[in-house]
Amino acid sequence: KLPVEHCIYGTHGWQIAEELEVEGATYIDKPTFGWSHWEEQKFDNEIELIGLCTDICVVSNALILKAVFPELKITVDASCCAGVTPQTHKSALETMKMCQIDIINE
């Protein structure tokens, strides 16, 4: 039922673009919208999320992370995200802001 099929393991566009790779960063492959194993991860002081779709996967995981780690700084780089439509992208960003998730590069 995905409105836009994306990030399907092993297909073109699944890997992190070389320009976005950060040395020492942790990359997590998740099988569905919201990943339920965040609590098993160790984070120093901040998490930055990017990806497709802002209004499905990004917002789901940002909210899960905020619930699991309420004091951890969680940032979403809006310039590295896209929604199904421009309006749903914007709505997802607003939802995350209301839940104390930092949005940069709008």
Predicted feature residues:
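Active-site-adjacent betaalpha module
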Residues: 2-106
